[in-house]
Regions:
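Helix-loop segments that flank and shape redox-cofactor active sites
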Residues: 2-6, 48, 80-84
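Short, basic, alpha-helical segments at the C-terminal edge of helix-turn-helix-like DNA-binding modules
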Residues: 1, 30-37
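Hydrophobic alpha-helical connector segments
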Residues: 22-24, 28, 41-68
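Helix-turn-helix
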Residues: 1-24, 28
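Hydrophobic/aromatic-rich alpha-helical bundle segments in the mid-to-C-terminal region
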Residues: 109-156, 164-165
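Amphipathic alpha-helical packing segments from all-alpha helical-bundle domains
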Residues: 61-78, 85-112, 120-124, 156-162
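Alpha-helical transmembrane segments of polytopic integral membrane proteins
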Residues: 39, 70, 132-135
Length: 165
């Protein structure tokens, strides 16, 4: 809080008055991140896409945007959660919100998926393939471009979830 107050040129009491606590700061950072990534709007666009492949292309793009614009936010969350129980609670809440949002998308898209997949299975596959850690592994440590990741994710989601023609 002290660093934020110093950087903003305000008293620490002002920071507390606005954000209340560390969770409030993390929520504000996350809100800006969601806005910058545009991923929620892309998911809404995907939900009205009548073509299953097009739907998954859009969510691959949304996922790429989410992690591409969120690397610093993820580092902030991880670092804060490692040392502060309040921040750990906020991280847990954020991840639960992500699961809920993705599960909603899967439920709304389930008519496109392979018949042998339950909604729970499709959700688990989808959530696993769209983890930040997977994006980070491929783009940061394995030399993939964000375009490579997006193309791979779209193809892999289609292979894993869609009925084959």
């Amino acid at each position: 809080m002290e660093v934020i107050a110093e950087q903003a040129g305000v008293a620490i009491s002002t920071v507390y008055a606005i954000f209340k606590n560390k969770r409030g700061i993390l929520r504000a950072i996350r809100a800006v991140w969601h806005q910058e990534s545009g991923q929620r709007d892309i998911y809404q666009e995907a939900l009205v896409q009548p073509d299953a492949g097009g739907r998954l292309d859009l969510v691959a793009h949304a996922t790429r945007r989410q992690w591409e614009t969120g690397a610093s936010m993820i580092a902030i969350y991880r670092g804060a959660a490692a040392t502060d129980s309040e921040a750990a609670t906020e991280l847990h809440s954020a991840l639960q919100g992500r699961r809920t949002h993705l599960n909603h998308f899967i439920e709304a898209s389930s008519t496109f998926f392979r018949q042998e997949l339950t909604t729970a299975q499709a959700s688990a596959i989808f959530r696993a393939l769209t983890l930040a850690e997977l994006y980070e592994e491929l783009t940061t440590y394995s030399g993939w471009s964000a375009d490579d990741y997006e193309q791979w994710l779209a193809q892999t989601l289609k292979q894993q979830l869609l009925m084959q023609k």
